Amino acid sequence: MIQNNSGLILQISSYGGFIYFCDVGYGVAHAAMDRLSYDMATELKDQNVRAITIHPGAGQTEITAFPDGESPNFVGRAVLALMEKADDNFLDQANGKTLFTIDLAKKFGFKEDYDTDGSVNEARYQGSKPFKEMMLNTLPQYDTESGLPKYSDTNNEGFADLFKGAKPK
């Protein structure tokens, strides 16, 4: 990429890099990926190599099963949109930043295969607003006063069942 004076490095991370979620390893790994994109963007800017992190919403994968969660195909469409549809101006502004897949869907017009009327995208977009507002706060990941979350306190019944390692023993 440096030799070609052009490139795009994309990382897929998680909101778990901003708040405590699951465990220490999960949060630290995702915070490191977010920071790595920022640092690479800083160092590689003069070589026209951009680094961007994308944050999918809750997912539907072989490991998690959030109701109406984003499919791997949806996340793949976000990657393709950045590679094929985003212009240089957009990529320059996104360089070093963390972007939500739902914001990319809204901008570039992709959706889940089953979302025939766009209502799933709209619900996800509305649902992402509190997370984006929290990200605007100064270092929200360093709020140690709130204590650790209790998965039993969530308003989503069965939340702990979504993660095999989440239930207390």
What does each model-identified segment do?
Residues 2-3, 8-46, 55-66:
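Catalytic loop of short-chain dehydrogenase/reductase
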Residues 50:
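Residue-level detector of anion-binding/catalytic polar loops
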Residues 53, 66-168:
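C-terminal helical subdomain
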